[in-house]
Amino acid sequence: MVISAPAIKPVNPIEYPSSDGEPVAETYDHFYAIAILLEMLRQYLTGRQATVLGNQYLYYAQGLPRMRVAPDVMVIFEVAAGGRDNYKIWEEGQVPAVIFEITSKSTQITDIGFKRDLYAQMGVLEYWLFDPKNEWLEQQLQGYRLKGEEYEPIIAGQSLVLGLQLSIEDKKIALHRLDNGEKLPFPSELAEQVNQERQAKLDAEQAKLQAEQAKQELEVLLQRYRDRYGDLE
């Protein structure tokens, strides 16, 4: 008699999607503010053990893939630098230190309610809201700092966690270092600086070539003089 073993159904691994197919931002102003802030923070934190992620799923409960949120910009310290498809707290061992939401009237309730409560429970040290269209926030840029288990408003616009002074410039968040007051350039300004430095280098090389050419021409003239009149006294 042949005894058949019961069929064992394979256990499917839990999937943690990296995207829901929704647009990154609802308007150009929101997208631009996110992209600029993301790039400036990445440049600022280059060389440090940190990563800056934008509009990517943050999973905060292992085994529960629906327990997720997608901050517009988040900064995480004490993790490997570089991008990720998504961020799982239990794998990385660190919660985001700072989160930015580029808010609007349509996301107002979620940003000031559910997300603020969630980020406080997670232990996110600073939570910043920026309203590029100035639709609903009394202050267009408002930060909150975690004290105990609740957030308190940041009055002076200073991110102590990042070491930066935050302000508004033409629908974008501008950043200045707290230690020396240096302004972090916007990507367009950084590109202009690179172009100016490149042009200055080209100008210096051209001037050097012209000087060498003039020297060679002078030596030719002097040699002709010597050939005709002899050495100069």
Set out the residue ranges of the language-model regions:
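Gly/Pro/Ser/Thr-rich low-complexity, intrinsically disordered segments predominantly at protein N-termini
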Residues: 1-233
